[in-house]
Structure formats: C-alpha cells, structure tokens
Curated annotation (Swiss-Prot):
This is Acyl carrier protein. InterPro entries: ACP (IPR003231), ACP-like_sf (IPR036736), PKS_PP-bd (IPR020806), PP-bd_ACP (IPR009081), Ppantetheine_attach_site (IPR006162). Its main location: cytoplasm. GO terms for biological process: lipid A biosynthetic process. Pfam families: PP-binding. The gene is acpP.
Amino acid sequence: MSDIEARVKKIIAEQLGVEESQVTNEKAFVADLGADSLDTVELVMALEDEFGIEIPDEDAEKITTVQNAIDYANTHQKA
C-alpha cells in the first residue's frame, strides 16, 4: 500500500467513523460506508487539507469510492 493510499484510507475512516479495515478500495462512501452528503463534503475538505490541493465541485462529485479518492490524490497532490 502506498503512502498516499494509507493516508486517504486513514482520513476516510476518521471522517466516516468506521474501522480502517472496512475501508477497502472498492467501497463506495454512501452505499458501503454509510456516508451522507455532509460527510462527503467534509471528506473532500479533509483530503484537500491533507494533500494541499483544491478539489473543484465538478471533480468532488466524481469522488464516490475509496479508489476514486486515492486516484485523485495521486494525480493532483502537490510535490
């Protein structure tokens, strides 16, 4: 597991109040991990803070799974 993947999963577990072991790449925030719309907004904000990036609304709407979040962080993180 990459450092980015581990950091993303830790943030998701903390934000959604689930065990880190439940946060697997294929899980969807709403359907599988019980997130609501406010949770997803807070999750995006936490990812922005952690990786020093800004996630536009149109991109945030597409981040619906753990893997989406990992891929986005990998692609957009600041060096």
